[in-house]
Amino acid sequence: MEPLRALELYSGIGGMHQALRESCIPAQVVAAVDVNTVANEVYKYNFPHTQLLAKTIEGITLEEFDRLSFNMILMSPPCQPFTRIGLQGDVTDPRTNSFLHILDILPRLQKLPKYILLENVKGFEMSSTRDLLIQTIENCGFQYQEFLLSPTSLGIPNSRLRYFLIAKLQPEPFPFQAPGQVLMEFPKTESEHPPKYAINAEKKTEEKKTGPKICFDSSTQCSGKEAILFKLETAGEIDRKHQQDSDLSVRMLKDFLEDDIDKHSFFLPPKSLLRYALLLDIVKPTSRRSMCFTKGYGRYIEGTGSVLQTTEDVQIENIYKSLTSLSQEEKIMRLSMLQLRFFTPKEIANLLGFPPEFGFPEMTTVKQRYRLLGNSLNVHVVAKLIKILCD
């Protein structure tokens, strides 16, 4: 097989490139494109022999695209226009312009690529931009399948539910193709169970209007229970976390932790402990789960990722018992017994599937590393999709 010639758009720190390597598909990345200067430094540090174009995608002409002579596109367009916490500007968001430029260029290429893989946030599947993408690739003759996948399905203790699309230039559909459906798991062989469907794409307009109640985790049922237990958690949330920690198909976090680190430099400051005590998602090295790490991790506390309890012999329930009735000093003393720390950038990179040799230039700060990793993707998930796509 001739090595594939892959074009990596919105390359970031090189998650797609790393996944392509892991897939063991013979391939060369002919060019990577990104405007983020810090991300580009990290990319060059890890992939020094790849042509890196530090320019906007809108600035690349049809002729320049043709000259690159690629037959595969790997891309992870900006997710902010589609996030739940963003404004969801969709096609009207200026950050979508570069992707619209790609959709405009694609049908006019001298030679269409054979393969396309796209990653984005959950929510992209409900967007007008997604509709334009589907319309464009269908008109070009691609067969495609959409997915919503999390690394937990590969035994990795990190929730990072993301949208993926794989497309292949061929007349026959994929063996697992489910028209109008978004698959919630990797394709099974015929001897295994049929795939789960998340969304019927035809009905998504009505779903937008009614605002469906969605269970994001297939391991638990949507529960009406609202009993607040310790911290600001409902009985349903506690139950879900216990179920995740009991799932023996998922590895423990300790497999992904660094041995020799200065723990103290990653401890949560007392002010954060006081302010966010009831909102923290606390995990232990023996836990089999962690929240999605976002680009604000280490800087913001709420909703940006889990924190690690390093004293395993202390029961968290005992620490939180009657916490609200204590003075500030007593609260800090009690919470400090948990020795809560942030995950290090290296540990997050491990959970995202980057190999041990993947590194950061010394000049990059911890804050920059968190930000870049929060914008990246899970290498193992993408590697598996590349194998499925090229099979």
Swiss-Prot record:
Q: Name one GO cellular component term.
A: nucleus
Annotated PROSITE patterns: C5_MTASE_2, SAM_MT_C5
Biological process GO terms, please? Answer: tRNA methylation; tRNA stabilization
Q: Which residues form the active site?
A: 79
All copies of domain SAM-dependent MTase C5-type, residue ranges = 4-391
What EC class does the entry list? transferase
The reaction(s) annotated as catalysed by this protein in its Swiss-Prot or TrEMBL entry are: cytidine(38) in tRNA + S-adenosyl-L-methionine = 5-methylcytidine(38) in tRNA + S-adenosyl-L-homocysteine + H(+)
Q: Report the leader peptide range.
A: none
Keyword annotations of the record:
Cytoplasm, Methyltransferase, RNA-binding, S-adenosyl-L-methionine, Transferase, tRNA processing
Q: What is its EC number?
A: 2.1.1.204
A GO molecular function annotation here is:
RNA binding
Q: Where is this gene product found? A: Cytoplasm
Which positions bind S-adenosyl-L-methionine?
13-15, 34, 57-58, 76, 376
InterPro entries the UniProt entry points to: C5-MTase, C5_MeTfrase, C5_meth_CS, SAM-dependent_MTases_sf
What is this protein's function?
Answer: Specifically methylates cytosine 38 in the anticodon loop of tRNA(Asp). Has higher activity on tRNA(Asp) modified with queuosine at position 34.
Enumerate the NCBIfam families for this protein: dcm
Which family is annotated?
A: Belongs to the class I-like SAM-binding methyltransferase superfamily. C5-methyltransferase family.
Name of the molecule in the record? tRNA (cytosine(38)-C(5))-methyltransferase
Q: What is the lineage of its organism?
A: Eukaryota, Metazoa, Chordata, Craniata, Vertebrata
